[in-house]
């Protein structure tokens, strides 16, 4: 059964983008709900130290997974263009080249992460009393990285041809299983952080295998035949050029976050715990504009491949309007509800942690429109075969964030509050650069019509 395929080349622009984006949003919502449930269980059952350990591990996990997610995302841009152009033979050849590239890099990265885990934990300035917990948690999670790669590759493949619903179904299965196993492992068996890591790995294997089987049964046009499995240097170079730059973008983004995590760690367990909870809330609240940016990218790429330039222009206008309205609404909610949101994660008696988290959310949450526009810019440049501009914008955003965070945090009167302020400033500078490039170089060029 072909679940939820959306035609992005014909019909209503706003409706098609929203219908395609909705499963992406729901999928990320499910993932964030799991993250919240996981944080809640760890914080309430295992305590502040375990919460700090798992929370500080999050940045490293995201950094490692961002490499093969970035590779798969870059591949999907090529897939979307070829699908929009009706080149199914070229699409299958690109899929084979992508399997070689993404699979090889994933295995290499997974082995390296396990071998160098201890020095990486020390490099992140993890407090001595937490290093053992962090190592135990990360070692198990990294053992299960390959299933994560498989799921994301097939999810991006299906999304590139307009199906964002099937990945949602298998993600939902994985998330529900993960939460159930979390409770069993930590509450019933008393396994600690190792239990939540093991639950994560088991659920990821289930979701990835399910999506792989579904794709092979329901999308025969995407299945590789012997004639497709022929090495093509041209195809591999094209895939690599897109995927490498997108992976660099994702890696730079998350490496910057990793450096910020190291700075946060230097302020002690209370700030670490507040940051861990606040980041989960933060990512939950701006997640819809991130997913809409990814849907927008697929829309642009398919229409770019099909030569529908006027439709691209109209799509840009619709996307900017939707992002603006949603971002302002969410910023208002987060500013008003941040004390309640923080109290949901930690005990009401942990007043210091709650106050730190509220400060973070009110500073960063007031400027979600900045990250909303940035996600549109990332998606647009990736879709029109300019992934290098996405890298430039990421370097501007994260470079500003990291440098400002370290500079401001070193001022005694500012302290860790400077880390929070560095984020929206980085977003704003990257938005300015991205809009300037579009207005001066691309808006009236033959690239977009």
What are these model-derived regions, one by one?
Residues 1-21, 79-146, 188-244, 300-367, ...:
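Short alpha-helical transmembrane segments in multi-pass integral membrane proteins
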Residues 8-46, 59-74, 78, 103-110, ...:
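N-terminal transmembrane alpha-helices
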Residues 19-38, 140, 151, 174, ...:
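Transmembrane helical elements of multi-pass membrane transporters/channels
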Residues 29, 33-52, 121-128, 184-191, ...:
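Helix-terminus/linker motif at the lipid-water interface of multi-pass membrane proteins
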Residues 48-59, 138, 197, 269-284, ...:
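Small-residue hotspots at the loop-to-helix junctions and early N-terminal turns
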Residues 51-111, 148-167, 274-338, 371-393:
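Small-residue-rich hydrophobic transmembrane alpha-helices
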Residues 63-66, 178-182, 208-212, 284-287, ...:
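Hydrophobic transmembrane alpha-helices of multi-pass small-molecule transporters
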Residues 72, 140-159, 167-175, 196-209, ...:
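Short runs within selected transmembrane alpha-helices of multi-pass transporters and secretion channels
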């Amino acid at each position: 059964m072909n679940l939820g395929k959306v035609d992005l080349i014909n019909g209503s622009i706003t409706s098609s983008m929203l219908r395609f984006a909705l499963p992406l949003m729901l999928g990320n919502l499910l993932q964030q709900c799991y993250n919240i449930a996981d944080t809640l269980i760890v914080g309430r059952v295992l305590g502040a130290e375990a919460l700090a350990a798992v929370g500080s591990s999050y940045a490293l996990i995201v950094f490692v997974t961002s490499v093969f997610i970035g590779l798969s995302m870059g591949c999907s841009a090529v897939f979307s263009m070829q699908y929009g152009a009706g080149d199914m033979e070229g699409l299958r050849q690109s899929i084979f080249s992508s399997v070689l590239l993404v699979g090889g890099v994933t295995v290499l990265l997974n082995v390296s992460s396990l071998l160098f885990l201890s020095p990486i934990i020390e490099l992140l300035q993890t407090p001595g009393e937490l290093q053992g917990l962090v190592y135990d948690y990360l070692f198990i999670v990294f053992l299960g990285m390959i299933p994560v790669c498989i799921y994301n590759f097939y999810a991006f493949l299906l999304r590139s041809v307009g199906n964002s619903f099937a990945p949602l179904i298998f993600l939902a299965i994985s998330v529900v299983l993960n939460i159930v196993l979390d409770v069993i492992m930590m509450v019933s068996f008393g396994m600690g952080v190792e239990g939540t890591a093991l639950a994560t790995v088991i659920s990821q294997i289930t979701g990835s295998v399910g999506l792989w089987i579904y794709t092979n049964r329901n999308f025969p046009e995407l299945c590789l035949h012997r004639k497709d499995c022929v090495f093509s240097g041209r195809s591999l170079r094209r895939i690599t050029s897109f995927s490498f730059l997108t992976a660099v973008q994702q890696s730079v983004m998350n490496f910057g976050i990793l450096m910020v995590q190291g700075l946060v760690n230097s302020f002690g367990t209370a700030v670490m715990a507040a940051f861990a909870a606040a980041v989960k809330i933060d990512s939950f609240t701006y997640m819809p504009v991130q997913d809409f940016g990814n849907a927008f990218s697929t829309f642009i790429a398919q229409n770019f491949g099909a030569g529908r330039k006027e439709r691209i222009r109209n799509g840009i206008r619709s996307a900017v309007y939707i992002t603006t309205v949603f971002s302002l609404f969410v910023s208002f909610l987060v500013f008003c509800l941040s004390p309640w949101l923080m109290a949901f994660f930690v005990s009401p008696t942990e007043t210091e942690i709650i106050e730190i988290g509220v400060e973070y959310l009110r500073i960063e949450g007031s400027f979600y429109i900045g990250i909303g526009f940035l996600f549109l810019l990332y998606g647009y440049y990736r879709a029109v075969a300019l992934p290098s501009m996405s890298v430039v914008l990421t370097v501007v955003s994260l470079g500003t964030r990291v440098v400002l965070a370290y500079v401001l945090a070193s001022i005694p009167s500012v302290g860790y509050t400077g880390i929070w302020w560095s984020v929206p400033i980085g977003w704003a500078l990257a938005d300015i650069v991205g809009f300037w490039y579009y207005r001066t170089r691309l808006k009236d060029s033959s690239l977009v019509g």
